[in-house]
């Protein structure tokens, strides 16, 4: 028999509240309750959550810190910020009689938390001391953003606190107003006008209340300590030691040798080694040593030379430096002992503390070995693979515009860290033309990584394509007979031509856009690929407008007092519609003539269509040879030409130029009232000479009428369509020449007995 399980747990009594009917209930305002809760949370900076007392929990009791600081109080007001900086300036000024107002460098320890605790007590502030410290630390790097201080207060703070001046406008203003001088870091080191500046205050001044700041100054490195470390390294290198590989044994010895120095003795050997590796070695080219000593140090430490210092070192020492910055060979010489730093005896003052900082592009010590050509090739293949979309088209990579650190996280073909690959790519992107890729592949790489193109690369690229460059020198488009490089889906509807530059070769330009010698431009481009050319209309249009051969045509066709009518923007087609449906639904105007046809399309106006298979630009006009035939006058009289007025044929909404030219004439057979029509000759047999002469006469007369109608068309267009562009008129003239040439070829085929493909 199954027993019933019972629990010994006693239920807790339920406390019930009974309201008295006679008691008046007050209405509670929820907004006041919420405001009260928020005020209570503001007052409590840290709250300890009480652990649960449930008997079912087996976890030990622990307290959890919950921060309740609100973000609304983190913003400093203008008065608070000015009060903070004026307090710092007063601390830097002398209060001793006879020296009141004189300013000295770094008299206060703004990095000490005790300093900001004292600042909070004196101003009776409500913020945390670290908030005052963070505010000062942030704006000391961009002090030009602090508004409300007088010019004298601002320049004194720049000098006393050694704040770097980061903007050129601020530097120019300080030079004009106070004749200040700067070091290579942008820190003010002296002035001819500010005579109240001192490097440090007199030792007799009372610094009571500021002893806590001196403790911070004792632990900071100065330029003297940097020089001591370099002397020690030179001695060890001369003995054959490796300061980087040996690490702690050498630097522990450095601490023992300088026990009397407070800064060095209070730090461990690991701290000195870390500072030497991160700060001193990358900034070796800034140190005041001779060039040969620096070259030996770069060689022994196996550290690459900064790019801006390579030329100087090569000129003075004759060292062989490879493309990565490493010294391959250095002529033998003796390493001299480094001389101590001597202060400059003038109105300038050297910074008391060391101004060396860790560079942003610091090379990892574990990755200092040279890259092999195979690794460089693997990096380029990875970049090319990542810059191709699903359709196989090269697109720009936004990550690679900067340093691209995250881009190489997926690079698995090497044991190096991705930070090292990133640093190597910064060097490789300047050596694209030295790779084994073809010109087209190099052009794709330049476009994908947004690398500015230099003059040598432009000379090579314009031999295969016409380039459109951005103001920064990067490639926006590259147009050739067989390819288009450039993402054109996000292009604006109207582009400013003066913002771009156009680089092209005249022969490649003619080959790309079609001439009489090359009648089928872009013939190898597929249909879906050619549709992308529609969106680059204005770039190609301005390309053609800059073409040198159009200058003569421009002078001949432009009307002096033509008033250009405002253009209406063409609505963008829907994504669901195909290119042909978008063409049918879009409005057609004379300035944006659209002719979307897979057989014989043409491009003109502001909307670029599929590239033509027939040329529209010809450097030389097509010249017809004079035709000889009998009884030409009688043939002309018998040929009935139906010629409609150009005004009726010119319908800007429905009729294109090609349709106008094809429909503006039609030939009829001679009158059959006097004699029956002659029988038709078979296709294979050549026509009789009399019939051939009659046919040639009709065709020649029809061509003449076509030219006459074309002139009437242009005259009508100039009178009624002032916005007809020069390039369009030139294209229409070229189209007329092509149609004339087609008639000539058809006549030759008739005379030879061949059939004509209509």
UniProtKB/Swiss-Prot annotation:
The keyword Cytoplasm does not apply. A motif (GBA) lies at residues 653-666. GO terms for molecular function: G-protein alpha-subunit binding; guanyl-nucleotide exchange factor activity. Residues 30-48 have a biased composition (Acidic residues). Residues 49-61 have a biased composition (Low complexity). Disulfide bonds: none annotated. Keywords: Guanine-nucleotide releasing factor. It comes from the Eukaryota. One of its GO terms (biological process) is small GTPase-mediated signal transduction. Residues 30-70, 668-690 are annotated as: Disordered. Residues 676-689 have a biased composition (Pro residues). Acts as a non-receptor guanine nucleotide exchange factor which binds to and activates G-protein alpha subunit goa-1. The GBA (G-alpha binding and activating) motif mediates binding to the alpha subunits of guanine nucleotide-binding proteins (G proteins). This is G-protein alpha subunit activating protein gbas-1. It comes from Caenorhabditis elegans.
